[in-house]
């Protein structure tokens, strides 16, 4: 382990651990690095993933859980304490046959439509990339990938809009605080369930990766079909006094 007392001068380490097991301090498991250890984090699929899952679900119009998930990958970087994969591909299938693929490429890889982080949507006549923030986009059509409407296309192509989403972080935060103060979820411009559905994709992907097999998921019950081992990973063992009740 890596020990440096200076890191803990202003930190309540027991509180920082929360429900995770009480283990000696290790700087490699601490701020930000916690993402890469199962006791605290969910890898980059749970770190960057939900940002992109939101956009993907909007584009696919999916307000439900997938019915199956398959996931493969591994850690292929230099020797480290990291437990989560740095290379990770997951495929989700929905009840209507829609297939959604998510990939984390921790090592060398190609760009996709000039984007290293973002979403790609494929249709019958072409495809579209959307950047990681959802603010730039570009469409292409036909076998020659001719540019259509988008952030990089001239107006003569059928219209050019520099933004898919308008930046409204300030109003977004204010809306969240207003909803808390009003104790009324209806005040929210984006419901809590949206965050749950996007975050669940990361958890489903990681569980399929950890058990090493394709899984069927019952979205209504929020349980795996006939897989007790996978079901155990839907929650965790909570360390007292940081336990959370099954019903909150």
Stretch-by-stretch model annotation:
Residues 1-248:
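Contiguous beta-strand/loop segments that form the cofactor/metal-binding neighborhood of enzyme cores
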């Amino acid at each position: 382990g890596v020990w440096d007392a200076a890191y803990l001068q202003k930190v309540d380490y027991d509180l920082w651990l929360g429900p995770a097991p009480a283990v000696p301090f290790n700087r490699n498991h601490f701020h930000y690095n916690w993402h890469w250890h199962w006791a605290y984090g969910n890898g980059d699929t749970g770190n960057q993933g939900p940002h992109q899952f939101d956009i993907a679900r909007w584009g696919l119009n999916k307000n439900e859980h997938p019915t199956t998930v398959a996931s493969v990958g591994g850690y292929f970087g230099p020797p480290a304490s990291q437990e989560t994969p740095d290379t990770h591909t997951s495929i989700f299938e929905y009840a209507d046959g829609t297939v959604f693929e998510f990939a984390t490429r921790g090592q060398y890889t190609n760009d996709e439509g000039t984007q290293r982080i973002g979403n790609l949507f494929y249709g019958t006549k072409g495809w579209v990339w959307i950047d990681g923030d959802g603010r730039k986009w570009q469409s292409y059509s036909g076998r020659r990938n001719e540019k259509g409407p988008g952030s990089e296309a001239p107006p003569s192509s059928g219209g050019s809009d520099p933004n898919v989403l308008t930046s409204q972080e300030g109003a977004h935060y204010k809306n969240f605080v207003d909803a808390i103060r009003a104790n009324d979820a209806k005040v929210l411009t984006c419901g809590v369930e949206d965050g749950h559905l996007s975050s669940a994709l990361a958890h489903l992907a990681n569980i399929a990766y950890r058990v090493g097999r394709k899984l069927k998921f019952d979205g209504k019950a929020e349980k795996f079909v006939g897989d007790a081992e996978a079901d155990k990973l839907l929650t965790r063992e909570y360390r007292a006094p940081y336990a959370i009740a099954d019903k909150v």
